[in-house]
């Protein structure tokens, strides 16, 4: 079987058929010779990683010359058996050319179209029936590779299993009661671990004097006993001793990472709740989720690499969802960063979301940020600590639809 794909800037459209079907050959047709040449080894690697052997090649045409497109496609059909046009991508003239050749080679050439937003395929040359595709799961790694980037190992990688999700929800239950205080305590624990911890690994031991020096002058904030007792009661720490010397042990490395990394809690609870959401059949709605994804990429005219970190990145089938999480003051630059990375690694398929707490902290910038987010097609989830968990989950369940 030979798949003929009309090369599109939304690169998932160029390889969707080859990822789903066992094609002998994938032929890219378009006017962007350099782009197709760069894409060829990337597509071959992605297909090979799925255990398939597909030859990838490309044919260059003049996209503004219908006769040239028809002639080139005619040559492709003559030189290959069982040709199938994928009409998912491509400009109008490509589709006109395909229609001409489907009529000319009736019975020899077939065509279909994928709807990647709802995982269906339409048989365009027969009865026009639309059927669901059982599984079109693209991983985060595959999606980033597809668009010419790579993921850099950026510290701890969370596993969102049942136990960790319970821990994440326990952390959220404590933190959302007073997010500013949580952030302060997280910074305090980080400082203790870096500057005055007498123990190692998951164990923390520090003196009262050290504890006092991390406190806020003239205020009641600090790493007080009630805060630590709440962590202990939720099973997040154990063996707590509170006196002239304070000591405790974190439950595990994942919990320690969340509690001792300022800002990590919001990212983790967003990812955790995404991992727990089910579809109508009881299957996980989002097939891949990661926190703190550092992407190394360069645009086609840049020599030096560009690095961007996405707080939470999720995949719904082949749809990437880029999520920025802010638990403090931020400005509109964060929206532009989100827009740039999402467009680069998803084009029109990418979904963009910003989750932020304490909107009142933005003061005069709040309405401007809301307006810019709306103009840029960025979904806003505001003040998640002020809504029920059910409402928070409802909002997260629909982020791939915006």
What are these regions (language model features)?
Residues 5, 9-24, 338-339:
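Histidine-anchored nucleotide/phosphate-binding helix
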Residues 6, 55-68, 326-329, 384-385:
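Short beta->alpha junction loops
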Residues 14-17, 37-40, 93-100, 124, ...:
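A short acidic (Asp/Glu
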Residues 25-108:
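A broadly used, surface-exposed interaction patch
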Residues 30-35, 115-120, 354-363:
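Short beta-alpha junction loops
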Residues 83-84, 103-125:
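Short, acidic/small-residue loops that bind anionic groups at enzyme active sites
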Residues 114-160:
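Beta-rich, aromatic/charged-enriched effector core domains that present basic-aromatic interfaces
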Residues 145-402:
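Intrinsically disordered, low-complexity Ser/Thr/Pro/Gly-rich regulatory segments
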